């Protein structure tokens, strides 16, 4: 049994078929092993948030669209954590990225939602949310 409460931990399986999990804003972690319990690690934080990462395929598609829209070299490192601004995107580039995402995924991103997208992961999470909403 493991208990995790309120800064940030990332867990990933050794099996490639399983998607990584992320938990943000942890306060403590306790991992008892074979009947032995270790003192919990305590960290400063006021709240607990669980982030559900988008499917890796969605993140990969978003990375490809971002690379294309920003005319980045194929060997550019674009990941879920990549910020559009850090990649050199200005506001017009961001609008074009959102338009490319809408076309690729068959979704409509509202202006308020588009303004909240800062990273590739933000975009991928929003896309999956909109696809789920559209099909449900």
UniProtKB/Swiss-Prot annotation:
Primary localisation category: plastid
InterPro entries named in the record: ACP, ACP-like_sf, ACP_chloroplastic, PKS_PP-bd, PP-bd_ACP, Ppantetheine_attach_site
Residues annotated with O-(pantetheine 4'-phosphoryl)serine modification: 91
SUPFAM superfamilies reported in the protein's UniProt record: ACP-like
Coiled-coil regions listed in the entry: none
Family: Belongs to the acyl carrier protein (ACP) family.
Stated name of the protein: Acyl carrier protein 1, chloroplastic
Organism: Casuarina glauca
Gene (UniProt): ACP1
